[in-house]
Amino acid sequence: TGEKPFTCTECGKNFSFTTSFIRHMRIHTGEKPYSCADCGKHFSEKMYLQFHQKNPSECEEYVTLKATLQSHQSVEKPFTCTECGKCFSLSSYLHRHQRLHTGDRPFSCAECGKAFSGKAQLQDHQNTHTGEKPFTCTECGKCFTRKGSLQMHQKIH
């Protein structure tokens, strides 16, 4: 029926199924309930853990890269969101993040009027009108309208 009764209180996105809603909420909560027994790395979705487990070298990579990641994460982040306290390295990142709280959607589709908080989301959406699928999987050749869909798909190979 197209009904989407589950609404995210953080960003306003709607979902048809509770499972989709729960998975989405992990973006905001940072919850990662699935963990690798070998290296302890945590994942927000079971399929990410399964992908990780199918690539054993990733565990060693993770352990060696952990120090690099920690140093990367220690980069100064002087721009703080007054709503939730999240910090950013650039003021433009903070500004973009704050749209989640304000609901500001300054990028509108000329075709249907649907509005988006970011330019990239609008560009992805516009591909649904044109039918253009500019993102191609190098493994199997399957094409996608959105880069995120391609990235998600590539995890199955």
Curated annotation (Swiss-Prot):
Compartment(s): Nucleus
One GO molecular-function entry: DNA-binding transcription factor activity, RNA polymerase II-specific
Gene3D superfamilies reported for this sequence: Classic Zinc Finger
Keywords tagged on the record: DNA-binding, Metal-binding, Nucleus, Repeat, Transcription, Transcription regulation, Zinc, Zinc-finger
GO CC field: chromatin; PcG protein complex; transcription regulator complex
Pfam family for this entry, one: zf-C2H2
InterPro entries noted in UniProt: Znf_C2H2_sf (IPR036236), Znf_C2H2_type (IPR013087)
Zn finger region (C2H2-type): 6-28, 34-56, 79-101, 107-129, 135-157
Annotated family: Belongs to the krueppel C2H2-type zinc-finger protein family.
Role of this protein: May be involved in transcriptional regulation.
Protein name: Oocyte zinc finger protein XlCOF2
